[in-house]
Amino acid sequence: MEVNHQNECVPYNCLKNPKIEMLDIEGISSRSREQVAEISLGLTRFLLESLLPGASFGFGLFDIIWGVIGPDQWSLFLTQIEQLIDQRIEAHVRNQAISRLEGLGDSYEVYIESLREWEASPNNESLQQDVRNRFSNTDNALITAIPILREQGFEIPLLTVYVQAANLHLSLLRDAVYFGQRWGLDTATVNNHYNRLINLINTYSDHCAQWFNRGLDNFGVVTARYLDFQREVTISVLDIVALFPNYDIRTYPIQTLSQLTREIYTSPVAEPGASLNVDLRNILREPHLMDFLTRLVIYTGVQGGIYHWAGHEISSRTTGNLSSNIQFPLYGTSANADRPFNLAIHYSETIYRTLSAPIYSVSGGISPNRTRAVEGVRFLTARDNNLNSLPFLYRKEGSLDSFTELPPEDENEPPYIGYSHRLCHARFARSSVVLEPSNFARIPVFSWTHRSAGPTNEVSSSRITQIPWVKAHTLDSGAFVIKGPGFTGGDILTRPNLGTLGALRVTLTGQLPQTYNIRIRYASIANRGGTLIFSQPPSYGLTFPKTMDIDEPLTSRSFARTTLFTPITFTQAQAELNLTIQQGVYIDRIEFIPVNATFEAEYDLERAQEAVNALFTSSNQLGLKTDLTDYHIDQVSNLVDCLSDEFCIDEKRELSEKVKHAKRLSDERNLLQDSNFRGINRQPDRGWRGSTDITIQGGNDVFKENYVTLPGTFDECYPTYLYQKIDESKLKAYTRYQLRGYIEDSQDLEIYLIRYNAKHETVNVPGTGSLWPLSVESPIGKCGEPNRCVPQLEWNSNLDCSCRDGEKCAHHSHHFSLDIDVGCTDLNEDLGVWVIFKIKTQDGHARLGNLEFLEEKPLLGEALARVKRAEKKWRDKRETLQLETNIVYKEAKESVDALFANSQYNRLQADTNIAMIHAADKRVHRIREAYLPELSVIPGVNAGIFEELEGRIFTAFSLYDARNVIKNSDFNNGLSCWNVKGHVDIEEQNNHRSVLVVPEWEAEVSQKVHVCPGRGYILRVTAYKEGYGEGCVTIHEIEDHTDELKFRNCEEDEVYPNNTRTCNAYPADQEGYEGACTSRNRGYDEVYGNTPSLPADYAPIYEENAYTDGRRGNPCESSRGYGDYTPLPAGYETKELEYFPETDTVWPRNRYSVD
């Protein structure tokens, strides 16, 4: 370390001790701007340290601002930005602003005096009345004055006085909330003042941030004045605004430790008044994790005999990580006119001040060479223990003092104690090479951070601690630091997808163990979930309810706080935290609220009150907020249930009634019947319908009320299902509706909303099944109910779900939602909306509850036009379907009627065979929309006529089976009922048909059949002969009366006289069914596709896929009696003979390959 012991103490004329380092500021230009900075930094320090409940804060605010600043000082505030932006404030605007500020100061002084008197005698009703009057007077004065301080056209130059008035107003309202009831105000009035306070925090913050950013944008490019504006207005406006949220006395009821992580720049280190002639566009750093300077290496060059700062290298570390080392690239050049100057900074040291020696040299004649450079800098350091540290000297000390632009925050302390900023980085500007040496410039630019953001994240045991997440020590892959909106005191973090932000290391300062409630300040474009990952297991689930729209800019109103349901107990002095978030979530900071019995009860009450009030659209509780789910209301109810009876029994009862009212409102707007799952299949036409394996279970540690469990299934044709229809009478025309609910866990859960078409999502939500691991017994209450009030191991209630390949994931959280648009309503048609949950895999499962179907919003603009187009398209296709149905129904009915001998459908025609029945069944199944393709138990538009004809087909099968005297004729039951000689096989072919194979000439199967002598019978056989020779099917009686059917490989097919065909005539692709499930008569599936009345070249006149419009056909429709008619292999033929038995017993016998 290079040390120059000469001139170690620099004069600073505001200090009484001449031995203490001092600064001569008498000759400094822009005095007004420096004074504004001093006042603003003093106010910021006061807000950081003294924003405590009670009257002392108001007294202090009066003492440092409103009791000491007069017209001259207010004029300095106005002059500051006038100089920065080169815009003069018109005289009448200036005079009006100053007069208003004076009036506010006078009114506030009277209020403060009455507050002092009341505090001395708080039970004096006269003093209570007086302080109420003084409060109202000052409040009204502020309401009138603040619009004048944002005069149109002068918003930017008025910012510094606007923020002072805004700060005063928030302080005044905070007093009313804190003291209101003791002043004699009723609860409603106090709550009204609180609501005004919260609203004005957002209003004032947004105004200041908006016009600050507008002011920066007006510069266009980065210049020296740009840096001055960024620095000075940050100090005089944004730093104060960043602390506005702490005025929320109910959220921050005790002293709060805040930090300002923003980074500002002092002016380029150059001789005052000299033109820079350098490009400053690369001076600003990109958003980054907060870092702390650990090493500065300065390289020295020489130009025209002047040794100067030619370039430098910087190393830094992140917060709380001594081992981290961020090495930045070389700035400038690594010149070697002198040995490098190496400045190594201990982790306990801070560079709080620089004294630079810039030089502006002009040499030569008519075309002189101009040199702008820095000959030396003294870096003054302080230690964390408030001790002065030896300075670092690079070559020489100069008179350009950083305190001119960044004065101390406390002038009553030595500068190494009262300083306001620490040096964190330096960049470098240089002249263009093409202009050198006539214009030569080498100029460093220093950047600084506020001293409130220290190098460690210490958590207090007695105060609320706010730690911006930009103070993490690592930035995880995929996470980004983005520029803060202006009112957060620094930059913020986000991610474009699900993942972690980065590890934040905290240090506990109190005696261990320490318990804290944890809050996160965030903004979110949708209802999202996240996980707080803790180095002392387990992890904790978080919800991030929507605070803004997707295209909305970040404003103060966009930010909210979310709280862990249970406190965290820290048992170690250091802890690592990380946060898992989803896309569209922006993280500002984490907050630690210390817990003790009394404070915890008060905190829980405040949190419950805030949560209950947030349920409603207004204070009169007439309506619920649309985006608040039924599940959320249950969680708020749990919050109220867990309030302490000892500390707040009356408040608990009042809040409980409000939550019950909210629950009733939630039930009223929910169009689903039996949303609490009192039963399934209880009423034929109402409520929930479902498969018999669904169970209803009472509330657990996830659900407060009943929920349903859907298991997996072994056959996708028989899925687990749950459905309900929303009646047309409940729907409004041209309105969007939303289905939503909560899924504890699921695998392969399909969700459908069906009207004109089907909206379909498959949701996989990992879950533990319980909040409690197997080794831990879930806490229960005295009656066996889940105890939701004990400290719990939390899981992620909004965990990202995983999607099956090729399927779109419905949601990224346990909260799911799906919307559907309704066009014109027609009570006669009663189209309604079908709500379906389905699982069709063996591994599938789901637990879900708090289901809601509710009106979301009227359709406007493009959404309205889109639903009208969809409705017209649906109606056009429905009309086409009706025409096609009429044709198909007529043909199907004719085929069915032809099977029977009479109109009572109780006797078959004598020549009706199994092929004819299957052919008729085929035609019946060409009737589309008999059932919903999404779930075949739900009737479709053509269910009536389909079931009419299908019932007659079933009758035909029954009659046919009843008149067939051969048992097990289709070999579906193997060789049951058959006598076997030799070796035979039963094979199941790929079309699920059982086939008898007789492989050897000596093998045969036979069956004794009882018949009625004198009656005629038909023996009909379908068979195929392999190889040479012949196979026989014989029928004989005991008297050896024998007939036979012979099958030869070389003979041509014999055809039944009335055009009976083998099923080769009907390929399956003509039918439009592609399912794998067979019909109930498996032995006849695909065997008899022939019918005497169906022409071989028949094809449908419509195309089914053209109608579905994204809705797939039901692959399991054949489970209702019709299979996938795959053609038989070539060579099979059907033969028959008539037989008239003379006895009551005959023997059919098969030889060789016979079916």
Swiss-Prot record:
BP-aspect Gene Ontology terms: sporulation resulting in formation of a cellular spore; symbiont-mediated killing of host cell
> Which UniProt keywords are present, listed alphabetically?
Sporulation, Toxin, Virulence
> Which Pfam family is one of those matched by this entry?
Endotoxin_C
Beyond the main fields, what else does the record say? Toxic segment of the protein is located in the N-terminus.
Q: Member of which family?
A: Belongs to the delta endotoxin family.
Source organism's superkingdom? Bacteria
Entries under PANTHER family matching the protein? ENDOTOXIN_N DOMAIN-CONTAINING PROTEIN-RELATED, PESTICIDAL CRYSTAL PROTEIN N-TERMINAL DOMAIN-CONTAINING PROTEIN
* Signal sequence coordinates: none
SUPFAM superfamilies named in the record: delta-Endotoxin (insectocide), middle domain, delta-Endotoxin (insectocide), N-terminal domain, Galactose-binding domain-like
Q: Per its record, how is this protein called by name?
A: Pesticidal crystal protein Cry1Hb
Question: Key word Acetylation present in the record?
Answer: no
